[in-house]
Amino acid sequence: VALIAGGVGITPIRALLEDMPGAPGDIAVVYRSARAAEVILRDELDELAARRGAEIHYLIGEPRSPSGDDLRALVPDIADRHVYVCGSTEMTRATRATLRRDGVPAAQITTEGFSL
């Protein structure tokens, strides 16, 4: 499983990290925030990831063009995972397109987009 969050989209992703079944190493979290000061729940996420044996990656800064290079570098087997994405509508749309280009079947992608 891969959990991908943008900004405050980490809130539902955090709940999935806590409750989702999986053995150590089965869950990867990728959390993008425009600025380091805007990363929320970091201590809690780090503790949960350590307890669950999950990988967690923080990407700080505005994303460049939607490219899967960074994502594949962080989660090389992304095409074999079910991917949950939560963030702005624009972010979830771009991430879904990137995942599809990277070979993730549509049935393995679940998104929740929102606008503020």
Name each model-derived stretch.
Residues 1-116:
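FNR/FR-type flavoprotein reductase catalytic core
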